[in-house]
């Protein structure tokens, strides 16, 4: 069993920068020992240890559970007794922990519940429910927090019978004690209105009760809650207007009190009921509209109220979507009141916003551009305004234009003093001008009552070039206007703007140069149309500015090189670099060695403490772009300059970088005639089991292993470890696709004389998986694999491959799985490979015809049905939109594919077009085979086909 003192020592060292890596490695070595998880829990529970050590333990435990609780098939990885003891101890432990530790253990419990609840954790519900009481609110808070950490999993899930059964199971146990506790807490708040300590814990409990109320109702409104809607919503209505000075700190302006959090959660719940359950909630909606109005018109603009304002506005937005409630607002008087009392106060720039701009510029940008963990007032107001405008564009536009004219007049009267009025003017014009949603591709439709290009010329362009701008935020507003309406400006206008934006990369103003970088990147990603992969900007368009753009962008990053965290803080700069590289393509090859050296320097600095997954991603994308556009004869030089750093990444086990490094090395090997000498030493370590344990590694290491096999399979003198990797992948539902990808390379690229001793075992593994735990995807990939083998190794080989396991087994597999699955394959490349491989069995398979003649007619039915299908589903384009990478927010949670060096799918039949070429090939092949048979084949087979397929065959053969 792991020693508690040793584990505590390593955890204490893990929070010190100089010892963090070593201690992490030591803990990883210990985690394989029996009882390690329990030891971690005991460390977390030890009140005599420093809180920092316990928190480090809670974080490590959370990640340990994510890594080690179950495999990809849901089987426990820990010993059974460890599993049971952890589940027994973790609930009472979490209940007793302080808030910051509860959060981490709550996530661990949620992970455990994902795999084990309810079937493998049947005692959980009764254990939780039995701990609830009317008097011990501290315990109640802990119990409810545990429950919420489990039940919040339901919120994003798709409806299913299994999910509803789980929810019903919980409701049957929880609803009665839950509602009783809600009423008790309400009563005790009233009874303790002058007792600050009691009020604080009671409101803590009330907050979690509201979150659970949402959990219980997130999928559908249960009958119990429908029956008790007056009770529950009556209590919540009461607390939206509740005030008590004991719950507020007048000196606190930034952080929301528990009372504000309670009101915000109520508004979130009320929005759910308005959106989803208006049929039962309708009679109460007007009461909540009134109280929300009172709230919004009475609370101050202090940041601590931002979350409440945002949630309240989101509720009003949901109300506005319902026509009968919109009519409350659909008149000039009401709309003026909304404008003056709600929208304008909440979109006007505050001193706190200006301070954020100056003191924490990257956070200002994230809030402005993306929103943040707590939604901004401006974002919520914009959503509300957009909904009002969609319902009555003329009324809303005219009312706001009248107010906006006044803002312009105030600004012009004293620009240096009244610059915020111009900021407000630009913000409101932008919000009014946009129709529909802003997608990653930008604005696609604008308000016909407004002219965005004319506004740009008159109001925006001067602020781009003026040397006497009243406040730098107006410069940012001007740049952001280009960013927002880039699709409405012509290419000629954008080309004129590019040098201006480029000059902003030389300023010291953080937000200015960052927005300039963002806007340059977005301009370079404008496509010729929404469905086109082609960009409007090409390398010729930026040839005169590419070098200076890259130089300035890289300089902005490296000026923070003293700190790995600060260096990697601003992913927008690196993303812009990547886009410039992608656009310039091969036009700056002489710069590649110098650029690569700078990126390697950045990687080396980041490696000390990887902190920003997006910055990391775009850094490696940029390296990939350079390699992709490098002439093949120059690759070895660049590889030699990278490999020392990459080998350090491996030796120091920098897991945040490893999947990227594997992809880059794989690309280099794919492009090389021989495996570079600096890469050869990786071949054997690549086969080590620990390399394949981290889920995020698997696609990349599979690609690298395939590239070794493709370029020089003799680098693996012993095939057993390679086949062991295949066995591991093919057994997994999560990685079966990678297993088939690897097997294709093994079967087609390794000399058959070397492979022959293992052929039968490969077939056994495939068939065992088919028998024991097949999935729809597995059977489809097996069908494609059969097609590939038939095409490349021959129909006779395929039959012997299966029948060597058991004579006659081929008939069962072919008839029950392959030909029934073929018509269901949607991916066009897979369909082509499988269809032509199956056809090959008929027209080139003498052994097939002699041994399995009864399969011919059913095989032909499958071929005709597939070849006649009009489906063109799911063939991926050659490009991947970079905006799809926005989800990258954490390291190691999933594989992050590098777009710049993406692997092309293997096509064994490139001469046959995946669309019309397949039908044409099938028709020609059948006609040719029929002619060789003396016109007997089709005459013989036609009566054996279904009537529908007889018609389809005739149409196919004549080219219809």
UniProtKB/Swiss-Prot annotation:
HEAT repeats lie at residues 1-33, 34-73, 74-120, 121-157, 158-220, 221-278, 279-323, 324-392, 393-445, 446-489, 490-528, 529-586, 587-630, 631-674, 675-716, 717-751, 752-794, 795-826, 827-928, 929-960. Keywords: Cell cycle, Cell division, Cytoplasm, Mitosis, Nucleus, Protein transport, Repeat, Transport. GO terms for biological process: cell division; positive regulation of protein export from nucleus; protein export from nucleus; protein import into nucleus; snRNA import into nucleus. It holds the Pfam family Cse1. Residues 23-96 form the Importin N-terminal domain. Signal peptide: none annotated. The keyword Transport applies. Its main location: cytoplasm. Export receptor for importin alpha (SRP1). Mediates importin-alpha re-export from the nucleus to the cytoplasm after import substrates have been released into the nucleoplasm. Binds with high affinity to SRP1 only in the presence of RanGTP. The complex is dissociated by the RanGTP-binding protein YRB1. This is Importin alpha re-exporter. It comes from Saccharomyces cerevisiae (strain ATCC 204508 / S288c) (Baker's yeast).
């Amino acid at each position: 069993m792991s020693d508690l003192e040793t584990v505590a020592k390593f955890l204490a060292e893990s929070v010190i920068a100089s010892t963090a890596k070593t201690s992490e490695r030591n803990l990883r070595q210990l985690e394989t020992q029996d009882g390690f998880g329990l030891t971690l829990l005991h460390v977390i529970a030890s009140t005599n240890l420093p809180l920092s050590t316990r928190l480090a333990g809670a974080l490590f435990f959370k990640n340990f559970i994510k890594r080690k609780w179950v495999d990809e098939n849901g089987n426990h990885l820990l010993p059974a007794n460890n599993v049971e003891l952890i589940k027994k101890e973790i609930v009472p432990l979490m209940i007793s922990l302080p808030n910051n530790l509860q959060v981490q253990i709550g996530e661990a419990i949620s992970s455990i519940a994902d795999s084990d609840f309810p079937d493998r954790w049947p005692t959980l519900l009764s254990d939780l429910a039995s701990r609830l009481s009317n008097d011990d609110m501290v315990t109640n808070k802990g119990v409810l927090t545990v429950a919420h950490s489990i039940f919040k999993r339901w919120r994003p899930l798709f409806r299913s019978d299994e999910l509803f059964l789980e929810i019903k199971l919980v409701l049957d146990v929880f609803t009665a004690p839950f509602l009783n506790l809600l009423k008790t807490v309400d009563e005790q708040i009233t009874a303790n209105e002058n007792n600050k300590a009691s009020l604080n814990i009671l409101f803590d409990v009330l907050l979690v009760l509201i979150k659970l109320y949402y959990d219980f109702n997130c999928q559908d409104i249960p009958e119990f809650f429908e029956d008790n809607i007056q009770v529950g919503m009556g209590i919540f209505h009461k607390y939206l207007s509740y005030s008590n000075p004991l719950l507020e700190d007048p000196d606190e302006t930034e952080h929301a009190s528990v009372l504000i959090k309670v009101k915000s959660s109520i508004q979130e719940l009320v929005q759910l009921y308005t959106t989803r359950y208006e049929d039962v909630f309708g009679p109460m909606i007007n009461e909540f509209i009134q109280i929300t109005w009172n709230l919004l018109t009475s609370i101050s603009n202090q940041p601590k109220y931002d979350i409440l304002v945002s949630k309240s506005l989101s509720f009003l937005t949901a109300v506005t979507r319902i026509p009968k409630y919109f009519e409350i607002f659909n008149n000039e008087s009401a709309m003026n009141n909304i404008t003056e009392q709600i929208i304008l106060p909440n979109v006007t720039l505050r001193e706190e916003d200006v301070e954020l701009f100056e003191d924490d510029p990257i956070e200002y940008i994230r809030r402005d551009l993306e929103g943040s963990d707590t939604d901004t007032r401006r974002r919520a107001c914009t959503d509300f305004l957009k909904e009002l405008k969609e319902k009555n564009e003329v009324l809303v536009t005219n009312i706001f234009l009248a107010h906006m004219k006044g803002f312009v007049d105030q600004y012009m009267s004293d620009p240096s003093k009244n610059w915020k009025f111009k900021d407000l003017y630009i913000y409101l014009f932008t919000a009014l001008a946009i129709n529909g949603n802003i997608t990653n591709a930008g604005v696609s439709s604008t308000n016909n009552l407004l002219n965005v290009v004319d506004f740009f010329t008159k109001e925006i362009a001067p602020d781009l070039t003026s040397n006497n701008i009243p406040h730098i935020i107006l410069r940012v507003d001007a740049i952001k206007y280009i960013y927002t309406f880039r699709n409405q400006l012509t290419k000629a206008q954008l080309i004129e703007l590019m040098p201006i934006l480029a000059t902003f990369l030389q300023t010291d103003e953080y937000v200015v140069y960052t927005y300039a970088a963002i806007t340059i990147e977005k301009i370079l990603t404008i496509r010729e149309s929404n469905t086109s992969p082609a960009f409007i900007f090409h390398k010729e368009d930026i040839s005169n500015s590419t070098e200076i753009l890259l130089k300035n962008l890289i300089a902005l990053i490296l000026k923070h090189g003293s700190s790995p965290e600060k260096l990697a803080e601003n992913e927008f700069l690196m993303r812009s670099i990547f886009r410039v590289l992608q656009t310039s393509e091969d036009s700056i090859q002489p710069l590649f060695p110098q650029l690569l050296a700078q990126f390697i320097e950045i990687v080396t600095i980041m490696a000390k403490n990887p902190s920003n997954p997006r910055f990391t991603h775009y850094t490696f994308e940029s390296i990939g772009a350079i390699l992709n556009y490098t002439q093949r004869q120059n690759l070895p030089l660049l590889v030699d300059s990278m490999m020392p750093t990459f080998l350090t990444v491996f030796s120091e086990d920098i897991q945040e970088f490893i999947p990227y490094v594997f992809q880059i090395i794989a690309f280099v090997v794919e492009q090389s005639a021989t495996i570079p000498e600096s890469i050869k030493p990786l071949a054997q370590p690549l086969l080590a089991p620990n390399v394949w344990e981290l889920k995020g590694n698997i696609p990349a290491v599979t690609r690298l292993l395939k590239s070794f096999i493709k370029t020089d399979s003799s680098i693996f003198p012993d095939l057993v470890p390679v086949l062991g990797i295949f066995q591991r992948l093919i057994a997994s539902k999560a990685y079966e696709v990678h297993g088939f990808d690897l097997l294709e390379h093994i079967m087609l690229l390794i000399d058959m004389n070397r492979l022959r001793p293992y052929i039968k075992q490969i077939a056994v593994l495939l068939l065992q998986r088919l028998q024991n735990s097949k999935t729809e995807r597995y059977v489809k990939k097996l069908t494609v694999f059969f097609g590939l083998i038939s095409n490349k190794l021959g129909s006779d080989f395929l039959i012997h491959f299966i029948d060597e396991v058991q004579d006659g087994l081929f008939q069962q597999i072919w008839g029950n799985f392959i030909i029934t699955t073929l018509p269901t394959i949607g991916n066009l490349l897979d369909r082509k490979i499988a269809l032509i491989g199956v056809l090959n069995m008929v027209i080139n398979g003498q052994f097939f015809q002699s041994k399995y003649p009864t399969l011919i007619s059913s095989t032909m039915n499958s071929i005709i049905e597939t070849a006649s299908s009009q489906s063109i589903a799911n063939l991926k384009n050659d490009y991947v939109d970079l905006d799809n990478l926005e989800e990258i927010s954490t390291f190691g949670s999933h594989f992050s594919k590098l777009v710049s060096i993406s692997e092309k799918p293997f096509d064994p039949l490139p001469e046959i077009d995946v669309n019309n070429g397949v039908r044409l090939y099938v028709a020609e092949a059948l006609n040719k085979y029929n002619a060789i048979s003396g016109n007997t084949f089709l005459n013989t087979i036609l009566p054996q086909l279904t009537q529908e397929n007889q018609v389809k065959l005739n149409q196919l053969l004549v080219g219809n």
